[in-house]
């Protein structure tokens, strides 16, 4: 049975893990890192970059570099690149494709199934959008699970014998969640959850950006936030400063030539202290404490009941966050799990449960928001209360609001407000064919089904006639099957184009290498090669040089093959002249470097890649 991978699709960074030998293992990416920046960029030549390479060029290509797309999941937001609109699902799919490819390279087999995590406070539209992104990336998403729940799995896998009540504080790049769980005897049961899908490390960065920009504006009269390239430099500087302030009490922000005016170039050279950073972000930290209070209250849990506090998400490395959590809970947060990796590890454990690799683990999650319908007067009538264990099914009998009413519109809402208009609309559908009768007489059963992924289905049945209507909630911001299929085809086409582009680069690199090595060896051999032979080789070299920068890969391969064969004849002759001993330290098999010769021309060695090395000045 093929592996099911676990993916933490994060706002700023993503991570992928898999079960091996009964333990979750984080998979390193092609750059050798254990997490991958959730960044996508589009190049002028049509190439797409994902991850660290995309983040690295963001300053020089800010308009075509997309970050924090997760914040727009489940909305109608679109990114326009070169006249083409991309949905958040499509951009997220590009990140998932990168993670999928890294997992396949690590496992040595094709990966088609995944468990993907989402913030606990993601609504139905955001969860659907995540599933769509997986589908576009070529992944069958077997389960969507909440990030704090996944983290608790990673924390509790080796602690299943004793009962614990744990509080998971998950502050990521773009979202914040708190979950309280009962853990014991292999059962992970979520007691309550609360959160804010628009609160995270990005907001802490933004406070630093605004502070720097306002200070610069006061001194120079220029708002750097209006300059996209300058703003991108500010973003990188803010993130770097935030990270440095986790281990230092102050940091230097130095941005030379940030902009210019009539008086000349302008620079930023300022010091930011941890105390000032704490002052700038105090209300954000307090907001997380308020959400913790709400989670405890809705779960009817006191702080004395909590045995352990787990910190999840890179933003929990901020000292003020750690201090606030410690002061509020009265407990030292557990450092037993890596905040950047534990969510992906938990997803891998859930994948292991689905494949049978992990035994005796039962995950009981909850729905984060109340589900209901609009009734007379615009009231939101709840059917499934928040923090109900899922999967769940609830039904209730309703009736008509007018005499002889033959149809009813069911307006499905999600949220905690009393009035339907104040909550999020998940969908509307109509039940027709109701037998005419005075108001209040017809009996219409409305049933809500919510599956283990948190995806909602609603049905309405006229008890008298048996007529039924139903809807699987797919918000207007989600993609239709046709749109998903189109995006899947585009993603597959791009993957094939990317493969061809990579092959072309490798062949051209090999051509450069074989030309260099051949010319070098010819010079070293000197008079040992006749003028006629030298002329023939030089002609072959010129042929490779002529075609190597073109687009005809087959022509480059043929020219390389011709050069290799011609030089091989000379090397064989020299070999015989030296009585079977390799002369002058010359090895014809190595003349083109590790990847040259006919093998390179045919790209037989998939394990060998050329690398570009960038020389940087010492800072």
UniProtKB/Swiss-Prot annotation:
Q: Where is the composition biased (Low complexity)?
A: 589-606
Q: Which UniProt keywords apply?
A: ATP-binding, Chaperone, Nucleotide-binding, Phosphoprotein, Stress response
Q: Which InterPro entries match?
A: ATPase_NBD, Chaperone_DnaK, Heat_shock_70_CS, HSP70_C_sf, HSP70_peptide-bd_sf, Hsp_70_fam
**Sequence ranges of Acidic residues compositional bias:** 607-619
Q: So which domain of life are we looking at?
A: Bacteria
Q: Name one GO molecular function term.
A: ATP binding
State if Phosphoprotein is listed as a keyword: yes
In this chain, the stretch annotated as Disordered covers 578-619
Where, if anywhere, are coiled coils annotated?
none
Tell me where in this chain the PTM Phosphothreonine is found: 175
Q: What induces it?
A: By stress conditions e.g. heat shock.
| Family annotation (NCBIfam families) | PRK00290.1, prok_dnaK
Q: What exactly does this protein do?
A: Acts as a chaperone.
Please give the family membership noted in the entry.
Answer: Belongs to the heat shock protein 70 family.
- Entry protein name: Chaperone protein DnaK
For this protein's source organism, the top of the classification is:
Bacteria, Bacillati, Bacillota, Clostridia, Eubacteriales
Q: What gene is it encoded by?
A: dnaK
């Amino acid at each position: 049975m093929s592996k099911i991978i676990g993916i933490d699709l994060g706002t700023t960074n993503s991570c992928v893990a898999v079960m091996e030998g009964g333990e979750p293992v984080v998979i390193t990416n092609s750059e050798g890192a254990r997490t991958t920046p959730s960044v996508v960029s589009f190049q002028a030549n049509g190439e797409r970059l994902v991850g660290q390479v995309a983040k690295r060029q963001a300053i020089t290509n800010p308009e075509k570099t997309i970050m924090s797309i997760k914040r727009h999941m489940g909305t109608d937001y679109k990114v326009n690149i070169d006249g083409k609109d991309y949905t958040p699902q499509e951009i997220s799919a590009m990140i998932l494709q990168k993670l999928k490819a890294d997992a396949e390279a690590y496992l040595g087999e094709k990966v088609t199934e995944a468990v993907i995590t989402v913030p606990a406070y993601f609504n139905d539209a955001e969860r659907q959008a995540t599933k769509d992104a997986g589908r576009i990336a070529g992944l069958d998403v077997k389960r969507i699970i909440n990030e704090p729940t996944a983290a608790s799995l990673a924390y509790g896998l080796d602690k299943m014998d004793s009962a614990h009540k744990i509080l998971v504080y998950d502050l990521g790049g773009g979202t914040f969640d708190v979950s309280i769980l009962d853990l014991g005897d292999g059962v992970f049961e979520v007691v309550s959850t609360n959160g804010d899908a628009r609160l995270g490390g990005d907001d802490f960065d933004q406070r630093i950006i605004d502070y720097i920009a306002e200070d610069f504006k006061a001194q120079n009269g220029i708002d750097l936030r209006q300059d996209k390239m300058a703003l991108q430099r500010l973003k990188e500087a803010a993130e770097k400063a935030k990270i440095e302030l986790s281990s230092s009490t102050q940091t230097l922000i130095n941005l030379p030539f940030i902009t210019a005016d009539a008086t000349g170039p302008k620079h930023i050279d300022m010091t930011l202290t941890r105390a000032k950073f704490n002052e700038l972000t105090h209300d954000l930290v307090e907001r997380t404490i308020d959400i913790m209070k709400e989670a405890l209250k809705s779960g009817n849990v006191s702080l004395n009941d909590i045995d352990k506090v787990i910190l999840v998400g890179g933003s929990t490395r901020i000292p003020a966050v750690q201090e606030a959590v410690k002061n509020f809970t009265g407990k030292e947060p557990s450092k037993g799990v890596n905040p950047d990796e534990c969510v992906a590890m938990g997803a891998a454990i859930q994948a292991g449960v689905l494949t049978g690799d992990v035994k005796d683990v039962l995950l009981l999650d909850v729905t984060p928001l109340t589900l209901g319908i609009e009734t007379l007067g615009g009231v939101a009538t709840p059917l499934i209360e928040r923090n109900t264990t899922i999967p769940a099914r609830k039904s209730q009998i309703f009736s008509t609001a007018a005499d002889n009413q033959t149809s009813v519109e069911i307006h499905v809402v999600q949220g905690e407000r009393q009035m339907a208009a104040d909550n999020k609309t998940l969908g509307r559908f109509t039940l027709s064919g109701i037998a005419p009768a005075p108001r209040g007489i017809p009996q219409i059963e409305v049933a809500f089904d919510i599956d283990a992924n948190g995806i909602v289905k609603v049905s309405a049945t006229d008890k008298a006639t048996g007529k039924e209507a139903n809807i699987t909630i797919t918000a207007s911001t989600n993609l239709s099957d046709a749109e998903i299929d189109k995006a899947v085809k585009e993603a597959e086409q791009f993957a094939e184009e990317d493969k061809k582009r990579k092959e072309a680069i490798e062949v051209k690199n090999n051509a450069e290498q074989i030309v260099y090595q051949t010319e070098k060896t010819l010079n070293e051999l000197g008079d040992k090669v006749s003028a006629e032979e030298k002329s023939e080789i030089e002609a072959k070299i010129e042929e490779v040089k002529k075609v190597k920068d073109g687009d005809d890969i087959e022509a480059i391969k043929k020219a390389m093959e011709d050069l290799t064969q011609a030089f091989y004849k000379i090397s064989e002759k020299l070999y015989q002249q030296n009585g079977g001993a390799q002369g002058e330290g010359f090895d014809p098999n190595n003349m083109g470097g590790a990847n040259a010769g006919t093998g390179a021309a045919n790209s037989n060695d998939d394990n060998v890649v050329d690398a570009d090395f960038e020389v940087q000045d010492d800072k």
